Amino acid sequence: MDNHAPMYPSLAKTILVVDDDPSMRLICVKTLRAAGFTVLEAEGSSESLKILATHQEPIDLLLTDLMLPTPDLQLTSTENPYPRVHGHDVIQRAFAMKKTSRVILMSGLSYHERKGYQAVTDHVPFLQKPFSVETLMQLVHEVLASAPLSFDDSAAKSTANPDVRWYG
């Protein structure tokens, strides 16, 4: 066995980190960059959807918070292709765009508070906040080394109505 072989798969991977909490986003971004990953960051779903739609290179992993702020009302005179939605909808839209096939969903909500999102959280890798840097890195490496997810499973799909046009 070569003692100089990397312990994990190639770190030449791109990760998109989405979290509205600046301190949590900073911890994730700094940790992942220090490990050699290329890291894109977004403070919310609108920004993350724009990155997913416009970034030219593959995004190997989407690390997103479950509870991203959404507006109470999202109506204006022009359609917004990058609406503010929760993290589970960001995942569903990322898969629909075929921009990533690996995700980690994170949240500070307890298991009981997440019950309404169980269809999603039971089908994707989940990171409970607060978490250690070691736990983050271990899960990131496990997910990148695993088979890509498929969102053909209707239980894991977003509860968002695809016929609803988002404005705002």
Per-region residue spans from a language model:
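Non-catalytic signal-transmission and effector/linker regions of two-component phosphorelay proteins
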Residues: 1-16, 22, 26-29, 46, ...
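Hydrophobic/aromatic residues positioned on beta-strands within the core alpha/beta folds
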Residues: 106-107
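Acidic di-acidic motifs
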Residues: 19-20, 65
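Two-component signal transduction core modules
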Residues: 62, 126-127
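Acidic, metal-coordinating helix/loop segments flanking the phosphotransfer/catalytic sites
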Residues: 41-61, 65, 69-72
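Conserved phosphotransfer active-site motifs of two-component signaling proteins
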Residues: 67, 82, 110-113
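Alpha-helical interaction/dimerization surfaces of two-component signaling modules
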Residues: 30-35, 51, 119
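Short amphipathic alpha-helix used as the core "switch/output" element in two-component signaling
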Residues: 50, 72-100
